[in-house]
A protein has these predicted regions:
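Conserved beta-strand signature within the Rossmann-like core of class I S-adenosyl-L-methionine
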Residues: 178-199
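A short SAM/SAH-binding and catalytic strip from SAM-dependent methyltransferases
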Residues: 152-173
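Rossmann-like AdoMet
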Residues: 1-83, 89-134
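Glycine-rich phosphate-binding loop signature in dinucleotide/nucleotide-binding domains
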Residues: 75-78, 150-156
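S-adenosyl-L-methionine
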Residues: 121-154
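Rossmann-like AdoMet/SAM-dependent catalytic core
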Residues: 201-277
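A short, conserved alpha-helix within the catalytic core of class I
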Residues: 131-133, 142-144, 168-183
Length: 277
């Protein structure tokens, strides 16, 4: 959310993400940091600093958010609900209440859900009636059971969002989650991001020595990846049809080039959009 908040300080024509809630949802120290980026030199220094963690990281994160936002906007007339897996401090559900009144299920670990509830109370005063916070651990709990306890129905045409999550899960959990989503109504949509499997196995580090050391060597935080050529067949196993797959080069052309900003992207992470058959 720091990225989305910082992007609000870019002029509208150069901004990659529009989200006026982003800064408000951050804890106080991060709000102070974001406030400092109203000064262009500080903002540019922060963006350049992100390159030390992972070259192209800033552009990748911003572009994936735009890709997901565009797909959700295109689908609003055709869906009955939204499910956000690994919601964290994501503001998408609250931006959505300005446009439509459909149920939005935000799923995350219990500790993150508790923090989200406090944050929403601080920013909005109360949780919107259309938003349901669902606490569970995808590694151990059943997703559909937890959703059903909060009013989810299998006849809903749902827009599922899984942004920046799959790499943190085991392959068993990713497959079990997709197996559960077999029950989604035809016409449901799924948008997700994934890192490439050759990064996970260490074959290609995509120039991100610091990131690889942090998520694969010092701590085993990332576990799962795919290769772009595998995605269609992988989804088809669970009744989903790949509609669009967007790599960094395509997303840069779509979102960054028109702004005139000189950002680089990494080939590490891709985005995919699918429909339930």
């Amino acid at each position: 959310m720091v990225l989305a908040a910082v992007e609000q300080n870019e002029p509208p024509g150069r901004r990659l993400v529009d989200d006026d809630f982003a800064e408000l949802f951050l804890p106080a120290p991060l709000r102070w940091l974001v406030g400092a980026t109203r000064f262009a030199p500080v903002r540019h220094l922060m963006i350049r600093g992100s390159e030390f963690t992972g070259p192209g990281l800033w552009a990748n994160l911003a572009c994936r958010k735009r890709f997901i936002a565009d797909k959700l906007k295109e689908s609003l007339d055709d869906i009955n609900a939204v499910v956000i897996l690994g919601a964290g401090l994501d503001t998408r559900a609250y931006l959505l209440t300005r446009r439509v009144r459909i149920p939005v299920f935000e799923v995350d670990l219990p500790v993150n859900v508790a923090r989200k509830f406090k944050t929403v109370r601080r920013v909005l005063g109360e949780l919107p009636l259309s938003v349901r916070l669902v606490a569970l651990d995808l590694e151990h709990d059943d997703l559909l059971t937890a959703l059903a306890e909060h009013g989810y129905r299998t006849d809903y045409r749902v827009f599922f969002i899984c942004e920046g999550v799959t790499q943190y899960l085991s392959e068993v959990t990713v497959r079990r989650t997709l197996d559960g989503l077999r029950a989604a109504a035809p016409g449901s949509r799924l948008v997700f991001t994934y890192v490439r499997s050759d990064f996970i196995d260490g074959t290609n580090r995509y120039g991100t020595r610091t990131l690889y050391r942090n998520v694969r060597q010092r701590r085993q935080l990332w576990h799962f990846g795919l290769q772009p050529g595998e995605v269609a067949d992988f989804l088809a196993e669970y009744g989903w049809r790949l509609v669009e797959q967007a790599g960094p080069d395509e997303l840069m052309q779509r979102y960054v080039v028109p702004t005139g900003r000189k950002l680089k992207a990494s080939q590490l992470e891709w985005s995919a959009y699918a429909e339930k058959t």
